[in-house]
Regions:
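An N-terminal assembly and electron-transfer interface module characteristic of large anaerobic redox
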Residues: 1-148
Length: 148
């Protein structure tokens, strides 16, 4: 299940005390983002807008939509980036999949023991890559992770 870093959003709202916020994210996360948007509005008593236009990542943040709505902060959810902010009011929020890779990692060990591999993932599983690397290395697989 995809888990959005709601604590970070709440901390930012409580610190900055905006009069309105907007949230956007990829199409697959929109139901969760919509629920979060409604909860923010109720919890903080501020307008919280869902920007439901299709977004394609950090190069397509829809900051214009947030500006049109006069949202003081735009939370872009689920597009991992090495930068936490792109504009003063645009904040990147992680969303990770909490699925376990234990079983598949064990099966990979059987095939890969003694070999060197490159380990890659998508942004929703970045939080697990170091654990998988450690598990594989402990079982005799040499693992390389590049920078992306």
């Amino acid at each position: 299940m995809i888990v959005i870093d709601e604590e970070k959003i709440f901390d930012i709202i409580e610190t900055r005390k905006p009069v309105s916020v907007a949230l956007n994210g990829p199409d697959g996360l929109l139901p969760k983002v919509q629920d979060l948007t409604l909860r923010i509005g109720k919890k903080y008593g501020i307008p919280a807008y869902l920007l439901a236009d299709t977004t394609w990542g950090t190069c397509d943040l829809n900051s214009n939509g947030a500006k049109v709505l006069n949202a003081e902060i735009l939370f872009n959810i689920g597009h991992t980036s090495s930068m936490e902010t792109f504009e003063e009011n645009v904040i990147m929020i992680d969303a990770f999949d909490d699925i376990s890779f234990d079983k598949v990692t064990e099966k990979c060990v059987e095939l890969l023991r003694g070999k060197t591999i490159s380990l890659i993932t998508d942004s929703q599983h970045l939080n697990q890559i170091e654990l998988i690397k450690k598990t594989l290395e402990e079982k005799g697989v040499n693992v390389k992770i590049g920078k992306g």
